[in-house]
Structure formats: C-alpha cells, structure tokens
Amino acid sequence: MTKEYKTITEISGPLVFVEKTEPVGYGELVEIRTASGEVKRGQVLDTSDEIVVVQVFEGTGGLSKDSSVRFTGDVIKMPLSPSIIGRVLSGSGRPRDGGPPIVPEVEREIIGAAINPASREKPRAFIQTGISTIDGTNTLVRGQKLPIFSGAGLPHNDVALQIARQAKVLGEAEEFAVVFCAMGITNEEAQHFMADFERTGALERAVIFLNLADDPAVERLLTPKLGLTTAEYLAFDLDMHVLVIYTDMTNYCESLRQMGAAREEVPGRRGYPGYMYTDLATNYERAGIIKGKKGSITQFPILTMPGDDITHPIPDLSGYITEGQLIVSRELHRKGIYPPIDIRPSLSRLMNSGIGAGHTREDHRAVSDQLYAYYAEGCDLRGLAAIVGKEALSERDKLILEFADQFERRFVNQGRDEDRSIIETLTIGWELLSMLPETMLTRIDDKFIKKYHPKYAGTAKKE
C-alpha cells in the first residue's frame, strides 16, 4: 500500500521539495494532490537522506505546503501499440487530437539507453529527401543523426516539414514512419505543422508530439524521450524505418538551464548546466541500426542558434555528438532562395557510406566535390569583386562567379513541394558544370565526363 505525505517544505518554480519519509528511487513517478482535489504528476529529480526534489510536469500553480504527495514506486512509461501511428499527442504523451487514450500492447520506460556500439550496424542506405542540397552534397544515410543549425526567423520548420513528407528509401517497400517532436513552439506554428501534415497526408505515417510555448517548461524535457521511446518501438518491434525530427532543441536546452537554476546548481558555459552535453547525448545516441534488426532510427534535430552564433554551447555541443550539420543561411534567405541551406559549412560525415554505385550513382562523389569546389571559389570571388569591381576579374573568374550565381538559382533553390529524385539532382549538377570547360573539371574522372556530361550524354545513350 502506498502512502501519501504532507511533508512539502518548499515550492520553487517547477520544483517541490519534500522531506523524505521512505526510500525513494531516482526518476520515480510522483502524484501530488492539491487542496481542490486536482492531481498533478511529477518525477523525482534528486534524492538524499533528508530531502526529495520533485519536478512537476504540469507546473506548481495551485500547490501549497498542505498538498499531499504520493510516491508510486514506478517510473514514467510510454503506452505503445501499432495504432499510435497517425496520433497527435501532447509533450507529456497524452492525446491532443480528441481521440481516445492509447490502449497499450506494451509500456516502455522513456529513459532509454544508447545503442551498444558492438551491436550497431554501420549506416549505409541512402535516404532521399527530395532536397538537392541534402541529397546531392550532404547526403542523409539511414541510421544517421544529422542536425539543422538555423537562426530565428529562418524557414527551418518548412524544411523539416518537407523532409517529413518526402523522405524515402529508394527501391525498398519497407514501412517508413516519422516521429515529429515539437518543443516550445507557438500555437501559430503548431497550426502550421498540423495543416501541412493533414494537407499532404503525411499524418497517416506520423506520430506527433506537440509541446507548446505556454505548456510547462519541464514537460519539454520529456518530449524527445517520449518520441524516441515511440521510435524505438516502431523500429525494433514493428521493423519500420523511422525518421525522428525534433524542433527546437534550443527550447529543450533552455528548459535544462531553467531546471538547473531552480535547483541552484553551479552553472557551466553561459549559464547552461555542466551536464548538458551528457543530456543531449542520451537523446542523440538513441539513433542507429541494431545488428539482426530490420528497423532503423534516423534523427534530424533542428536547433536555432542564439544570435546566429555557431560557437554557442547548444550547436557547439550538438556538433560533437552528431554526424555532421546542415547550416541554414540568413544571406541565402535574404536572396529569396529556398531552402537556404549553405553547403559550404554544412557536412554529412556518413555521406560516403550511402552514395556511389549500388546506392545513388557512381559519379555522385565526384560531382559533389566539383560543385563544392567551384561554388566555394565563386563565393570568395564575390568578396574580391566587391572590392576591385567585376571588370577587373579574369575571364575564368567571371565564369566561376556566374557558376556560383546559377548554382544558387538552380541547384539550391527549389519549390517547397518540389520532390527531386537523386537522378534529377545529379542532372542539374552536370548541367551547371557544363557551363565550364572540360579542362576545369579536375575532380571528375574522364570516364564519368564521357558518360554523364550533357555534351556526351546523348551519344552515350545511343552507344
């Protein structure tokens, strides 16, 4: 029989301090009953011989020292069944779509563990997102964790939605699902997400967790863990390939800082807790493929860099854990280019595992390298032209400058509903490279030039 205690000594922000009257486990689920009879849920955050610290998910409004506390002896679990696909849930896992509660086939603890490195399968399968700057130059591979580093006011949410509805594995009929975790978003953003999912039919293969800006901040710490627990069930129990998209991890980290301040912890860099790196890793490292299992988890975390500062602790620490990054550029956005992904500072560390013959096409790496090289040189020449004038540039430099402009207009820029195949992306790449003399294509093997260059493509097909 569980006991209820009226031993609250202090209420501070989202935290309740309770005098310890029985052995209590870390992470244990707590129920707190207010004077009006309302029951609020919480979790044991810290425990010692004298005091138990409880974080309350629904906020501490209405609580007093007379409120009763009950320790359940259990941890937070996520109810799971195949019918969860297509559902919209709150940041704490409760139905938000007006539907019935989930009738679970299994219940899983939400505090999962990273996949054992010895049990991991190397990510190899190419995921086509339909976005050229990702598929062509920063390829996403199944089982990878590839974040988007963005800034306030940039269209990263539109990019996330486009990936959610277009992502697919080529040549495979295996089931594909999306787990979408939104943290600290506004009501307007939530309506935008839901309208897009319903308009495109993507909701039929998605599970959505919505934590709004006016929801308790502590709930934000649960949202990605609930989403990942759901993804693990879909991937490793139901053999599905799951893409997990979080937006915005910056709001998640702000909640961590808020909790640390409420507990009066010694802060780390810029006031964030010293364990933020470890906490982020417990989320990111739940991506991957397990040997002997058919399913996989691929992660697409999205975070807004405060002040567009890539050295800020949140993007800085995320970059150490994840396998690359996609950078959303304010400069490209000002030019009206969508998606404004700047390929120069972007990187996919697992790209080589998922491209080439048998995955995309044999010329993929060479075309990508050549596009990178001349686009980067063209961007440098823009700075030079601004100083000395375009007329002072050599003919070669003018050609590369024009190439960079065309690259942004034709390769980077595409419609919000435009789903390009990898062949279309590579074809656009070759058309751009055909602007340059063949002697300048130094990073591409002659056999690829003879086979795929627009000048020879028709001849190659006839032969």
Curated annotation (Swiss-Prot):
GO MF: ATP binding; proton-transporting ATP synthase activity, rotational mechanism
UniProt keyword annotation of Membrane present: yes
Localization: Cell membrane
Superkingdom, taxonomy of origin: Archaea
Membrane topology: Peripheral membrane protein
Signal peptide feature range: none
GO CC, alphabetical: plasma membrane
Main location: membrane
InterPro entries in alphabetical order: ATP-synt_VA_C (IPR055190), ATPase_a/bsu_AS (IPR020003), ATPase_F1/V1/A1_a/bsu_N (IPR004100), ATPase_F1/V1/A1_a/bsu_nucl-bd (IPR000194), P-loop_NTPase (IPR027417), V-ATPase_su_B/beta (IPR022879)
GO biological process, one term: proton motive force-driven plasma membrane ATP synthesis
Keyword Disulfide bond in record: no
The entry's keywords: ATP synthesis, Cell membrane, Hydrogen ion transport, Ion transport, Membrane, Transport
Function: Component of the A-type ATP synthase that produces ATP from ADP in the presence of a proton gradient across the membrane. The B chain is a regulatory subunit.
Subunit structure: Has multiple subunits with at least A(3), B(3), C, D, E, F, H, I and proteolipid K(x).
Family under the similarity heading: Belongs to the ATPase alpha/beta chains family.
Name used for this protein in its record: A-type ATP synthase subunit B
The organism's taxonomic lineage, starting at the top: Archaea, Methanobacteriati, Methanobacteriota, Stenosarchaea group, Methanomicrobia
